[in-house]
């Protein structure tokens, strides 16, 4: 029997429910911070690339500060790094932090937002296919059903046919966003098996901050914009307050919760649950910004929720392998 299947079983049982809750909390954190990012971008105080740089760099500062403080206090022994660990973190930071955000911002600049979102969330399919075909981890029918429902829900919710147009570079960027998002889950899944979640996320953000600093020098950042105001929920709100939510909730908390979920859930299941982000963003925008949800958005949200419920129920149930009948995960610990 395949070692990878043991890993999947161990992730699902007996803590699959915990993984589901962590993945849902991560999606809520990502989605809830969306309207705050939108307010900053709409105000014109920061460009999309500068916003990405600020959130990643400040998140790195916060998390690396915690890592250093914990090591100095002796609360956690220093991890013995290997060359493989270093390359994994470099890949995670470059793809999971930088590529997905930069490519998405380029995509929405050249494509309708619905089309760009559809591109990005095709990562749900990419992760499931990669796990099944290249990693030889056959996925249960419930996961494939969840993937199908999640993608269908995203299509209905984003209405990509509205104002439809295609751009070559926009499509390339959209594909890059999908690959970056898939890498976030696949590399994160491997990383959580090798490194503590906090260190993986903190050093990954650090790599992302360095990569962006090479392209966008920090000394050219428009720091004066932090003292300006942007319209949020009908009021003038300091940009630094909006960005604080984006950094602490939409980046630090969201990434840490997402990586923690991957310690208990296989990446294909986690990606399906992650599609809740777009629904949460729409609901928060409706509740806070007064943006009305259309019938299509509500219907798409229901479809996404159905897919999440299917996958969550699968994670709750004990793992069933083709060769064995109701195998206990504690008996599947890799040697």
Task: Give the positions of each predicted feature.
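Membrane-interface helix-cap regions at the ends of transmembrane helices
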Residues: 5-11, 59-81, 149-165, 208-238, ...
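Hydrophobic transmembrane alpha-helices of multi-pass small-molecule transport proteins
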Residues: 63, 129-130, 139-159, 178-181, ...
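Juxtamembrane C-cap of transmembrane helices in multi-pass membrane transport proteins
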Residues: 29-46, 51-52, 58, 101-111, ...
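Hydrophobic alpha-helical transmembrane segments of multi-pass integral membrane proteins
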Residues: 17-22, 50-69, 91, 146-149, ...
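Specific transmembrane alpha-helical segments of multi-pass solute transporters/efflux pumps
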Residues: 29, 70-116, 120, 156, ...
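Glycine-/small-residue-enriched transmembrane alpha-helix faces in small-molecule transporters
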Residues: 1-53, 163-190, 211, 323-335
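Specific alpha-helical transmembrane segments that line the substrate/conduction pathway
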Residues: 50-61, 104-138, 177, 267-286
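C-terminal-most transmembrane helix of multi-pass membrane proteins
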Residues: 2-9, 56, 159, 239-241, ...
């Amino acid at each position: 029997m395949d070692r990878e299947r043991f890993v999947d079983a161990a992730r699902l049982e007996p803590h699959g429910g915990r993984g589901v809750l962590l993945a849902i909390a991560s999606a809520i954190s990502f989605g809830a911070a969306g309207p705050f990012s939108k307010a900053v971008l709409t105000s014109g105080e920061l460009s999309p690339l500068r916003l990405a740089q600020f959130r990643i760099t400040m998140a790195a500062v916060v998390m690396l500060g915690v890592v250093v403080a914990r090591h100095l206090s002796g609360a956690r022994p220093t991890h013995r790094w290997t060359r493989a660990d270093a390359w994994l973190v470099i890949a995670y930071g470059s793809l999971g932090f930088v590529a997905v955000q930069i490519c998405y911002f380029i995509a929405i600049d050249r494509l309708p937002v619905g089309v760009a979102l559809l591109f990005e969330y095709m990562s749900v399919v990419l992760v499931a296919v990669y796990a099944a075909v290249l990693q030889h981890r056959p996925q249960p029918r419930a996961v494939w059903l969840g993937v199908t429902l999640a993608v269908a829900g995203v299509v209905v919710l984003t209405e990509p046919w509205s104002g439809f147009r295609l751009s070559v570079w926009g499509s390339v960027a959209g594909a890059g966003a999908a690959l970056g998002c898939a890498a976030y889950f696949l590399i994160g899944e491997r990383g959580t098996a090798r490194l503590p979640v906090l260190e993986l996320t903190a050093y990954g953000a650090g790599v992302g901050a360095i990569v962006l600093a090479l392209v966008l020098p920090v000394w050219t950042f428009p720091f004066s914009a932090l003292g300006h105001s942007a319209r949020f929920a009908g009021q003038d709100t300091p940009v630094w307050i909006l960005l604080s939510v984006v950094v602490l909730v939409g980046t630090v908390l969201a990434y840490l919760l997402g990586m923690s979920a991957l310690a208990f859930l296989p990446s294909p299941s986690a990606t399906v649950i992650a599609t809740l982000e777009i629904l949460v963003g729409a609901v928060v925008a409706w509740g806070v910004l007064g943006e009305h949800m259309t019938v299509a958005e509500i219907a798409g949200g229901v479809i996404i929720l159905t897919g999440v419920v299917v996958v969550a129920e699968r994670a709750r149930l004990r793992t069933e392998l083709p060769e064995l009948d109701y195998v206990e995960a504690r008996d599947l610990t890799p040697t």
